């Protein structure tokens, strides 16, 4: 058996990121059941960075992650992790109060813009006009290169003398 200060089980993106962080504080062994890391959930990740998605706790984690994703450490990745995207939440014209409630829930700190019915239709011409209300646009939402991010954590773990054990 190998000696380790930390044993992390699961080498998907969550396990790899935890192992990378912990490796700054001691010897880490990262165990993966599959023949390669990221075989399951990481490979099917939605790959969207949004500060408006999910409950308040998830939104707080997203906001806290932005700086790292925008400026990962030198040598962590070969190209930017985030790419341009933006998101649009389309309101129901029969129930405009739901969009109002969402905007209020997100609060003044949310980086969203209220778009008119016409703006939403101009941006997404395939929308049916009769089913489209006003919208909330989040221009800061980004695509995440999940593979590059995952590989950066694994490379960083090895660079900190951590060990990945597959087929464990």
Q: Residue spans of the language-model regions?
A:
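Beta1/beta-strand and adjacent pyrophosphate-binding region of the FAD-binding site
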Residues: 1-14, 29
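Short, flexible, mixed-charge acidic loops at enzyme active sites
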Residues: 40-46, 127
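Glycine-rich FAD pyrophosphate-binding loop
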Residues: 23-42
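Short beta-to-alpha linker loops that shape the active-site pocket of alpha/beta-hydrolase fold enzymes
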Residues: 34-36, 120, 153
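Helical element adjacent to the flavin cofactor pocket in flavoenzyme catalytic cores
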Residues: 136-168
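Short beta-strand/turn micro-motifs composed of small residues
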Residues: 10, 32, 91
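Gly/Ala-rich phosphate-binding loop of Rossmann-like dinucleotide-binding domains
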Residues: 19, 23, 156
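Dinucleotide-binding Rossmann-like beta1-alpha1 core, especially the glycine-rich loop
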Residues: 46-123
């Amino acid at each position: 058996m190998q000696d380790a200060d930390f044993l992390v089980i699961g080498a998907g993106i969550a396990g790899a990121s935890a192992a990378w962080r912990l490796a700054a504080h001691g010897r880490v062994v990262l165990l993966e059941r599959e023949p390669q890391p990221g075989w399951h959930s990481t490979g099917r990740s939605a790959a969207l960075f949004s500060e408006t998605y999910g409950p308040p706790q998830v939104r707080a984690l997203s906001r806290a992650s932005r700086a790292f994703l925008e400026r990962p450490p030198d040598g962590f990745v070969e190209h930017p992790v985030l790419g341009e995207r933006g998101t649009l939440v389309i309101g129901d014209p029969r129930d405009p109060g739901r969009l109002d409630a969402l905007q209020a829930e997100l609060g003044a700190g949310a980086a969203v813009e209220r778009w008119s019915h016409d703006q939403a239709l101009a941006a997404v011409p395939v929308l049916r006009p009769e089913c489209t209300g006003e919208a909330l646009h989040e221009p800061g939402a980004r695509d995440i290169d999940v593979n590059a991010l995952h590989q950066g954590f694994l490379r960083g773990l090895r660079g900190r003398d951590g060990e990945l054990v597959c087929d464990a």
